[in-house]
Amino acid sequence: MHDPQDVMMNLVPIVVEQTSRGERSFDIYSRLLKERIIFITGPIEDHMASLIIAQLLFLESENPKKEISMYINSPGGVVSAGLGIYDTMQYIRSPVSTMCLGMAASMGSLLLTAGEKDMRFAAPNARIMVHQPSGGFRGQASDIERHAADIQKIKRRLNEIYVHHTGRTYDEIESALDRDNFMSAQEGLEFGLVDKVIERRAEDEKEGSDS
């Protein structure tokens, strides 16, 4: 049985460009990286996080004042991996805009709302899901207690991050994240997870990308 990620990588389009030195080919994601566009697609895990972090650091080194665009379509994943990306977004000097296409769930929703203020977007048919962290553990009773206490610490920290980026109170966030909470793009806007629902790119942005 084939790994879906391997199948996807084999289907990634190649872009060929003419340069003064002849033809150069890029996979589509590398070509878009040249335009300061990053994709978070699929489950968020350690390997993906290291690639996203490296791209963010590279683009900051190229131009610390220029915007980085991050497109998100993710069901979420490992909390520590997601927080690594989050911390890097806050650490670098480049402003990071975020855009949800498809789904931003769990850690995906946290990264969506972590974008630069007034630069957090969702497509009209995007779905956003927030919830509290979960985990399973086996072992001695004392180990289980420590693990449960650690999950509570993580829960509090994630709640604080949502409070910071949405402007909601801690109690509102805790209530919203108590169970899987699915929102439409408009509901995500009203909750404060994004700043705007956009259907079409602005004309001046189109012109800028063509120049």
From Swiss-Prot:
Principal place of residence: cytoplasm
This enzyme's EC code(s): 3.4.21.92
Keyword presence, Glycoprotein: no
Domain of life according to the entry: Bacteria
Enzyme kind, highest EC tier: hydrolase
Catalytic reaction equation(s): Hydrolysis of proteins to small peptides in the presence of ATP and magnesium. alpha-casein is the usual test substrate. In the absence of ATP, only oligopeptides shorter than five residues are hydrolyzed (such as succinyl-Leu-Tyr-|-NHMec, and Leu-Tyr-Leu-|-Tyr-Trp, in which cleavage of the -Tyr-|-Leu- and -Tyr-|-Trp bonds also occurs)
Biological processes per GO annotation: protein quality control for misfolded or incompletely synthesized proteins
GO CC annotation, single: cytoplasm
Gene3D superfamilies: 2-enoyl-CoA Hydratase, Chain A, domain 1
InterPro entries, alphabetized: ClpP, ClpP/crotonase-like_dom_sf, ClpP/TepA, ClpP_His_AS, ClpP_Ser_AS
Metal-binding listed as a keyword: no
GO molecular function, one term: ATPase binding
Subcellular location: Cytoplasm
Alphabetically ordered keywords of this record: Cytoplasm, Hydrolase, Protease, Serine protease
Family matches, as CDD domains: S14_ClpP_2 (cd07017)
Active site (UniProt): S106 (nucleophile), H131
Subunit structure: Fourteen ClpP subunits assemble into 2 heptameric rings which stack back to back to give a disk-like structure with a central cavity, resembling the structure of eukaryotic proteasomes.
HAMAP family, alphabetized: ClpP (MF_00444)
Similarity comment: Belongs to the peptidase S14 family.
Summary of the function given for this chain in its UniProt record: Cleaves peptides in various proteins in a process that requires ATP hydrolysis. Has a chymotrypsin-like activity. Plays a major role in the degradation of misfolded proteins.
Stated name of the protein: ATP-dependent Clp protease proteolytic subunit
Species in which this protein is naturally found: Maricaulis maris (strain MCS10) (Caulobacter maris)
Encoding gene, per UniProt annotation: clpP
